[in-house]
Amino acid sequence: MAAREGRAPLVRRAAIYGGVGLAAVAGVAMWSGAGSHRGTGAAGDAPEAAAVGGVAVAASQAAVPASAGVPPSLAGSSAPRLPLDAGGHLAKSRTVRDFFDYCLTARSDLSAAALDAFVVREIAAQLDGTVAQAEALDVWHRYRAYLDALATLRDAGAVDKSDPGALQLALDQRASIAYRTLGDWSQPFFGAEQWRQRYDLARLKITQDRSLTDAQKAERLAALEQQMPADEREAQQRVDRQRAAIDQIAQLRKSGATPDAMRAQLTQTLGPEAAARVAQMQQDDASWQSRYADYAAQRTQIESAGLSPQDRDAQIAALRQRVFTKPGEAVRAASLDRGAGSAH
């Protein structure tokens, strides 16, 4: 279970953009064809909250010119599209949270006020002059309130994942905060995620129950799995196959298998198409690692040149754009840069 529900998509992006190697990208290659299943004005809207939101929006719009640049961490990328329903209102969809999580990726580059202004601009770029624009701004303020409330929890909500009691408390706390701050947006934002976490918790309780025999545990786990909706059960089966394949890839690499030998073995297990995708991803990953190493060496030279922080960051951003020209590459490089910086 994620320590912060609001951070989950950011963790997913870090796994995609970071240098996690073949095992992780193999999962992307194998299941890239599988569709994702995602779920005006939230229930219990308070006039005071709407008024505060309106003031904040007006201030942000007045303070930031339309020509303000994209944060370095998002250079070369674009925000997800905000969905609308048939009436032109903001659709209650998980995609709205994905949009805000995309914007939140820039938190390391921006102050809180600048981040608000950036979100205002991104919303206006898609919804300017529509009723959905005000709705999106309201949901953004609610989501920020949710994240702020999570941050007040002990250890920012971090919990021992092996302790069912602590996990249960954490789930209940997050669900309560989500409903209090997001109203009926809590279901599209976190409903599927919370269901999955409660399912995982139920599995953990069964596996840790010392009063059960192995046969009884297996029986209860099978019964629990049957409670899953059909699409969730299919998704879980895909995850299980993915994990098994990733374990197999790791073992093949550990044993020193050649690329051809790995492909032959994976073809037997996954089929020729998936094996070919894994092989291509391996080549792409090797190319990426080489280019990032060259870029990192040039970045280090810039960092050692004694430039002002503004000039240094500008030169590094320009270098990143020159080296990484494919969609998403510059964002991935920026994510790795931040990870390297936090490690020192």
From Swiss-Prot:
GO biological process assignments: lipid catabolic process; protein folding
Signal peptide: none
TM helices/strands, residue ranges: 14-34
Location of the protein in the cell: Cell inner membrane
GO CC annotations on file: plasma membrane
Keyword Ribonucleoprotein (UniProt): no
Pfam entry (one): Lipase_chap
Any one GO MF annotation of this record: unfolded protein binding
Membrane topology of the entry: Single-pass membrane protein
Alphabetized UniProt keyword annotations: Cell inner membrane, Cell membrane, Chaperone, Lipid degradation, Lipid metabolism, Membrane, Transmembrane, Transmembrane helix
Chief place where the protein resides: membrane
InterPro entries from the UniProt entry: Lipase_chaperone
Record NCBIfam families: PRK01294.1-1
Function as written in the Swiss-Prot or TrEMBL entry: May be involved in the folding of the extracellular lipase during its passage through the periplasm.
Family the UniProt entry places it in: Belongs to the lipase chaperone family.
Protein name per Swiss-Prot or TrEMBL: Lipase chaperone
Protein source organism: Burkholderia cenocepacia (strain ATCC BAA-245 / DSM 16553 / LMG 16656 / NCTC 13227 / J2315 / CF5610)
